[in-house]
Amino acid sequence: MGSVVIGVAKMRKMRADAANNPTPLQVDVERLLTSGEIAMCQQIFKNALNYSKVRIVRGGILGIPTLTGNAMTPAGYIHLPNQEYLNIKDFSIAKNTTDKHWFIHEMPHVWQYQLGENAVWHGINQLCKGGYGTTVLTVDTPKSGDYKAYVTDLSGADANKKFNEFNFEQQGRIIEFWYDGGYLQHENPYREHHQKSIKIIGYVEYILRDFLHNPKDKNLLPKV
């Protein structure tokens, strides 16, 4: 009986201690870039970015990334849908090659932000223009088409444009094509996106010529 009383007393003390000194629940909501992800980005942006300031964030922004399944990068942080945040701990070793060029597509928005561009304003501007509601089909889009804000015709009507003449989403798409065509050629090379990237890589290189020479140049930021 005495041991039972002692046991009950210990339990009460443990409960009191827990109430007075609660252990905070650690919830994984954001992370830094991994060394592998930084190496990926340096192939494109060189030392134009402060990589230590970049975060990968779980959800946020009123839950829009999780509801839509799309990443959003309004202020230098990449907000992923909840499930993708939990599943992809390092984009540089992601099993799905699509995830790699998805990540690279978002990094130009980090670049735009760090060089002083207001991505939120550009996003609202594209939304008002119907850029995220109208699907368009061109030679650069997937067979299912793409939202108007992202659409390019790099081997046709857009071939002679400078990089700063593309909107902020198109800039992300162009760099995405460059990365897939130039750095993912040994990863499932028969993918539709890769084949398209290879086909237009000469046009992409011409459009990116100033960016590839000096990615720190603020004159390359989108003017539309």
Predicted ranges, named:
Residues 69-70, 78-106, 159-164:
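Short pre-active-site segment immediately N-terminal to the catalytic Zn-binding motif
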